[in-house]
């Protein structure tokens, strides 16, 4: 069933990791449908998780366009559990993907004259918050948006990211959080280099 398998399968069984078809419309436009990895920027939000035996995959439709300096992707995903003869549309994320549906737009700009790149991301996740016992389904939506910037020259490699999250989580609680990160790397020669980086997560507010 489309979207029934978990994002990371640890059961040691035989599974299909990737199976997709891509249609090239010409002039930079394409559509890609099926089970596929979604890898963007520094993989903080969407990544392949290649250190896991099975990797990370999504059953999704990806629509895209690319030219010399610009690239944009629109991603649509919908998940469901095994076939049901009764019981409604309740989705149990503990045995499948962590989200019920997803809509994502990603844009990347690559400059011509300087080694600079910038990405923008907006993701809307539909999370099941219904009642598993009664099979009543209710979907809450969580939005993540932000940017990822890079600059590289002969010695320096700089990148930074900022993401903000709002909406409702799977417990139907209001969310307002952010994450910021930055990395500066310098290569003294082919053997020696230095890297300085930091991450900041807003975390949860203390209950009073």
Mark where each language-model region is:
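Solvent-exposed loop/turn segments at secondary-structure junctions
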Residues: 37-40, 80-81
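Surface-exposed loop and membrane-interface regions of Gram-negative outer-membrane beta-barrel proteins
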Residues: 1-27, 40-51, 131-133, 165-175
């Amino acid at each position: 069933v489309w979207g029934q398998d978990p994002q990371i399968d640890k059961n040691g069984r035989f599974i299909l990791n990737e199976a997709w078809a891509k249609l090239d419309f010409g002039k930079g436009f394409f559509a890609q449908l099926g089970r596929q990895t979604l890898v963007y920027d520094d993989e903080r939000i969407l990544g392949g998780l290649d250190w896991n035996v099975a990797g990370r995959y999504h059953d999704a439709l990806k629509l895209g366009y690319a030219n010399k300096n610009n690239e944009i992707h629109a991603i649509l995903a919908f998940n469901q559990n095994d076939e049901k003869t009764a019981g409604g549309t309740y989705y149990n994320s503990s045995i499948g993907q962590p989200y019920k549906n997803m809509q994502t737009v990603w844009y990347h700009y690559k400059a011509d004259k300087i080694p600079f790149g910038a990405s923008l991301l907006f993701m809307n996740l539909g999370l099941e918050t219904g009642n598993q016992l009664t099979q009543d389904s209710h979907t809450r939506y969580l939005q993540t948006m932000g940017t990822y910037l890079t600059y590289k020259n002969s010695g320096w490699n700089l990148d930074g990211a900022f993401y903000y999250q709002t909406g409702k989580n799977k417990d139907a609680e209001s969310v307002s959080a952010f994450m910021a990160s930055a990395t500066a790397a310098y290569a003294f020669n082919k053997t020696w280099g230095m890297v300085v980086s930091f991450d900041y997560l807003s975390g949860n507010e203390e209950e009073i």
